Curated annotation (Swiss-Prot):
Higher taxonomy: Bacteria, Pseudomonadati, Pseudomonadota, Gammaproteobacteria, Moraxellales
Pfam families in alphabetical order: RE_AccI
The protein's enzyme class: hydrolase
Recorded GO MF terms: type II site-specific deoxyribonuclease activity
Protein name, UniProt field: Type II restriction enzyme AccI
Subunit structure: Homotetramer.
Catalysed transformations (reactions): Endonucleolytic cleavage of DNA to give specific double-stranded fragments with terminal 5'-phosphates
Keywords: Endonuclease, Hydrolase, Nuclease, Restriction system
InterPro entries xrefs: Restrct_endonuc_II_AccI
GO terms for biological process, alphabetical: DNA restriction-modification system
EC code(s) of this entry: 3.1.21.4
């Protein structure tokens, strides 16, 4: 069974409530206006792509990373953007979504096309693309993952202590208030709160206000509710494939039969995961809420995004030197000004063993 056949079989296991491969993709509306935040995110994504490209090309003797993903410096509201965007939508339906990078063996690398084939019409490079050994979609995240995880551990510990201290205070000081037929169920409820159940624990705050003692215990239940909500928040940073992209990535694999991967670039590390593993993870409902969640991403135009725990993937770079950055002024139509941030430089220190493993490259070859 070749790569495409394996992926096709995996798509049959993905819940249709998440991705229905039998239905055509939803048509996208052309954006009408860009924002400073959108352009900054785009610049950050371009930097992350360049970071991975340079890291591979500077460390590999036998492989080359080539820019491939459809992109343009135009943004919504500028002349020519509507045409670019509609051409992009047509290409999505024709060949699928180009990954940002292609990895070629140097023996297959076309020096006349060079390191950037992103502007070449797809029908002119079909056979060339099929020679690639991998396609990589590069995602970026404006976090330091190590510091984030440290902060989440501190947060979880703090609110766990608050939750159990509050529970104990209620049971120790307000048992007389709760020992009433209409309120005794809260005693049973509090006794079921343990380290094992706190991640799924939920209750409705009573709303008692008829006397001072009831108001006091009601406020303690409010504090307990807040602490539990904090504990139950997602506490990991993610590899972030958009739900709308799953179909068009599959279409690209169907067209070219080239293995596809997602690399998530943080400002201190890079993690990678295969599209094959993504489909395997989201096909298992037992993983939902444990190693992945499905959320509306406010940082990405509120698009529905699959958020997979980064630690599920491979650490591709164990360290990243941060880029330099500067503010840019951009004048739009009618004199509207946008100010955004650009990123330059930086270095990703690759874990070559993990990179070879995820891409399926023998050590002697790399």
């Amino acid at each position: 069974m070749d790569y495409y056949d394996r992926i096709r079989e995996l798509t049959k296991n993905v819940p249709v409530e998440l991705v229905d491969f039998e239905q055509p993709r939803d048509l996208a509306r052309t954006p009408t206006q860009a924002s400073s935040n959108f352009i900054t995110n785009k610049e950050q994504g371009d930097w992350a792509e360049d970071l991975v490209t340079r890291a591979i090309n500077e460390n590999s003797k036998n492989f080359v990373a080539v820019k491939y993903g459809k992109s343009d410096n135009l943004v919504a509201g500028e002349n020519g953007f509507d045409t670019f965007y509609q051409d992009f939508q047509t290409e999505l339906d024709t060949i699928g979504k180009r990954p940002d990078l292609l990895i070629f063996k140097k023996t297959d690398f076309d020096t006349t096309l060079g390191f950037d084939v992103s502007q070449i019409p797809h029908h002119q490079i079909t056979d060339y693309v099929k020679k690639a050994i991998a396609g990589i979609e590069v995602r970026s995240s404006a976090f330091l993952i190590d510091k984030y995880e440290e902060a989440m551990q501190v947060r979880t510990q703090r609110f766990t202590e608050i939750a159990f201290q509050t529970r104990d205070k209620i049971l120790a000081e307000f048992l007389d208030v709760l020992d009433h037929p209409s309120r005794s169920k809260y005693i049973t409820l509090l006794n079921t709160l343990t380290l094992e159940t706190i991640s799924i624990f939920d209750f409705k705050v009573p709303g008692w206000r008829s006397n001072e003692r009831l108001i006091e215990v009601n406020n303690l239940f409010k504090r307990l509710k807040v602490a539990i909500k904090e504990i139950q928040k997602r506490d990991y940073l993610s590899i972030t494939p958009k739900v709308e992209d799953i179909k068009v990535v599959y279409k690209w694999i169907e067209t070219f039969n080239v293995p596809h991967f997602y690399f998530q670039v943080f400002f201190d590390k890079v993690y990678g995961i295969s599209f094959e593993q993504i489909l395997t993870i989201i096909s298992n409902s037992d993983n939902d809420g444990v190693i992945f969640s499905v959320e509306k991403d406010v940082q990405n135009q509120n698009k529905t995004t699959i958020k997979i725990n980064s630690k599920t993937g491979y650490p591709i770079a164990s360290k990243v030197d941060e880029p330099t950055h500067e503010s840019i002024r951009k004048e739009m139509d009618r004199g509207r000004l946008l100010f955004y941030v650009t990123f330059k430089g930086g270095t990703a220190y690759l874990d070559l063993d993990n990179l070879r493993t995820i891409l399926g490259i023998e050590e002697a070859e790399f």
